[in-house]
């Protein structure tokens, strides 16, 4: 599912990262999860990996990193918490069975 500028969900990404970090920045995990379930999302691009982020961004992400996830009035940071939230909304990503859910979360945190 392509990025949809009108989608209710917004994921923050860096405009630029150095070659050694490409593919390893944690917003990729969130975007991948949304793509897997066909959930449209918009993308907010902020400065590069080593740039100081604007104060208004630090209110959403106190470490100045990515991603930040916004949906309606909800704002989350840290990819693990965002992935659990997305998984809670869609069983294809996070099983309801306690044992299976625990295994899925173990792999999610390890990744």
Give a label for each model feature.
Residues 1-111:
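GST-like domain detector, emphasizing the conserved glutathione-binding G-site
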């Amino acid at each position: 599912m392509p990025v949809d500028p009108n989608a209710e969900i917004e994921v923050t990404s860096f405009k630029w990262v150095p070659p050694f970090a490409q593919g390893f920045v944690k917003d990729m995990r969130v975007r991948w999860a949304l793509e897997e379930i066909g959930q449209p999302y918009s993308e907010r691009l902020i400065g590069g990996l080593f740039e100081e982020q604007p104060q208004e961004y630090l209110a959403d992400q106190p470490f100045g990193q990515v991603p930040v996830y916004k949906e309606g009035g909800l704002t989350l940071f840290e990819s693990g918490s965002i992935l659990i939230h997305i998984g809670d909304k869609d069983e294809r990503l996070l099983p309801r069975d306690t044992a299976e859910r625990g295994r899925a979360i173990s792999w999610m945190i390890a990744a």
